[in-house]
Amino acid sequence: TRFAIQILRDQIGQRVWPAHRLDRGTSGALLFALNSATANRLGQQFEKGSVDKRYWAIVRGFPADYGSIDHPLSRQRDDYEFQGKASSSEAQEALTRFCKLAEIELPLAVDRYPSSRYALLEVEPVTGRRHQIRRHLKHISHPIIGDATYGKGRHNRFFAEQLGCQRLLLACVELAFDHPVSGERLPIKAPVSGQFAAILARFGWPDTQ
């Protein structure tokens, strides 16, 4: 997010304020404001859960066609938080919904099975805990490909070495929020690109949201 702030600031020639953040390695829609007051109003929408967020993720295995992951997550402090601020490691409620968009089984023994299964999911994090999607998908044993922290090393290496994909296969493809002045509901879409789009094409999966 910090690098995106710098790039956008240089492009438009003025300071910008982020309304939210994406995990490092996650691509997709980022929302910025041109002043701090607007950024605060947008940030409040994220905190209240009134912003609709849709992500795409490529995971190991074949999850159910639809599902909800209702699993508490312990709080994780990040580098942006004030270090002197009191915090608790107590588990917080966390809910993620998903639906399966596509799947594929490759006749290759990447792990202990004679073939390897992968799926494309559309994911909606209802709550906004740190690393929520990545941690929840690991919890149901369908980790995201390219996730060095919560994923499976053998599958990550297979995608990197055999498919030329070295990135975390998680992207924010749509945000919908209320305009902080007019109140109009605004959807913003961010198509996947680069290595993510190349994997979709290679597997014959749809690339439109």
Residue spans for each PLM region:
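Loop/turn elements at beta-strand to alpha-helix junctions within RNA-recognition modules
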Residues: 36, 126-127
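Short beta-strand segments enriched for Tyr within beta-sheet-rich domains
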Residues: 129-137
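Phosphate/ribose-recognition catalytic cores of enzymes acting on nucleotide-derived substrates
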Residues: 137-182
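Catalytic core of the metallo-beta-lactamase
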Residues: 122-124
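RNA pseudouridine synthases
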Residues: 1-120, 140, 158-160, 169, ...
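Conserved beta-strand and immediately adjacent loop positions that scaffold enzyme active sites
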Residues: 28-30, 134, 174
